[in-house]
Curated annotation (Swiss-Prot):
<dbReference type="GO" id="GO:0043590">
    <property type="term" value="C:bacterial nucleoid"/>
</dbReference>
<dbReference type="InterPro" id="IPR004401">
    <property type="entry name" value="YbaB/EbfC"/>
</dbReference>
<dbReference type="InterPro" id="IPR036894">
    <property type="entry name" value="YbaB-like_sf"/>
</dbReference>
<protein>
    <recommendedName>
        <fullName>Nucleoid-associated protein MGAS2096_Spy1605</fullName>
    </recommendedName>
</protein>
<comment type="subunit">
    <text>Homodimer.</text>
</comment>
<dbReference type="GO" id="GO:0005829">
    <property type="term" value="C:cytosol"/>
</dbReference>
<dbReference type="GO" id="GO:0003677">
    <property type="term" value="F:DNA binding"/>
</dbReference>
<keyword id="KW-0238">DNA-binding</keyword>
<dbReference type="Pfam" id="PF02575">
    <property type="entry name" value="YbaB_DNA_bd"/>
</dbReference>
<comment type="similarity">
    <text>Belongs to the YbaB/EbfC family.</text>
</comment>
<keyword id="KW-0963">Cytoplasm</keyword>
<comment type="function">
    <text>Binds to DNA and alters its conformation. May be involved in regulation of gene expression, nucleoid organization and DNA protection.</text>
</comment>
């Protein structure tokens, strides 16, 4: 019985630590960039879009497709950074579970 109580206490402790790491991650910002940094997209760690910036050189009414492609590239870059940071930050908890 005592062993089960210890496991529960350890699990609760890990849960609190994980919640803190999730909050820390959510407070961080990640900026994805397109080729030549012509488009940047900034997200919080919980994947909320904070802003998109376009360099003047990429804004061409005759070539909207390039702007769309660069925007997609910047967004995907930022989301990949968030996913990698999440795995690095929260993945460590998987090996610490008491069961």
């Amino acid at each position: 019985m005592m062993n089960m109580q210890n496991m529960m206490k350890q699990a609760q402790k890990l849960q609190k630590q994980m919640e803190q790491k999730q909050a820390d991650l959510a407070a961080m910002q990640f900026t994805g960039k397109s080729a030549q940094d012509l488009v940047t997209a900034t997200f919080t760690g919980d994947k909320k879009l904070v802003g998109i910036d376009f360099k003047e050189a990429v804004v061409d009414p005759e070539d909207v497709e390039t702007l769309q492609d660069m925007t997609t590239q910047a967004i995907n870059d930022a989301l990949t950074q968030i996913d990698e940071a999440t795995k690095k930050t929260l993945g460590a908890f998987a090996g610490k579970l008491p069961f």
